[in-house]
């Protein structure tokens, strides 16, 4: 081999690591939900078309993700370039200037295609701070086969009382079949998302118009008594450890007759590759009780860029790709139209999608009905259905969630949990200077 060839080969070998080092690393923090895991898997398509961007994934359990992101963004730590957040964080962090505005999006992104309730929930004073990956309401899942065998009929929108009665009829713990599955895992976005909407349906509210907590009221007592007694009697063992993913696994394995949770689960419970009850699952609106105001939540997992990111352009490129119509088509082509991330775009709800996704009509109608500005039967000073959009809510909701989880395990009574929630919330609100 002559010297000139050797020199060329040596130069080429040296260039390879330099090319690899030249790629900009984009660190993405996300939640370990199925749709996000699919996004991570399909992100190879993005990397192929963006060889100058190398993706680094940090995938965390929901409560852990929220804690990590809150700490990082409040301290401007800069650990992450792209965050998976919800409407609560988008509103508060956007207002504080902690997030980059999602402006200057390409025309083919079709911003006007986003559902108004979702776009508004991720905006502050008309400025969009996060791009919605999927959006959800809460709906009722139930086993059509079990209802038919028992001679029961699920209403289009049941009451919680009716669900309790159905759960009693369908509870067969000796056969590994439980009447109802509900979130019990403590967390402001876990058990309190479910309990918050249940309480709304019973006519309760977090605060009165003077920002005084209302856990001492009769509506909260009825709501929590129902939740605890129903889940203790007719729920699965260890319900206090179950969040969205745990209950999804239980329902898919045929262990839950009824499940009230996020509409995004629709594509998973009807997927025969992961659900034993895909053909036997029915869908209804989230239960009401004395009202349907605030009976169904509104939530979106969305992608946002922290102001501390050192890779803002790369982050916007990926966020735009992952929330685009083109990404939806990619999912439809590779994994089936029913698996397209739901709830964010009007164009998703084509006739083909509606035909392939039996949960789609209930989901879309629920998303049209929700109103975070008027979330409860009685007037309130806050915005938010299953949450209260104030900075203090994350700590308050987490603490109340722990107390209600303790009531579920029998460590304290419902009355004791409510009294403790009233005291701790009043103390936190006073410390924060409410009413403001």
UniProtKB/Swiss-Prot annotation:
CDD domains tied to this protein: PBP2_TMBP_like (cd13585)
Pfam families: SBP_bac_1
A GO CC term attached to the entry: periplasmic space
Record localization: Periplasm
Keyword Lipoprotein: no
Job description of the protein: Binds mannitol with high affinity.
Protein name according to UniProt: Mannitol-binding protein
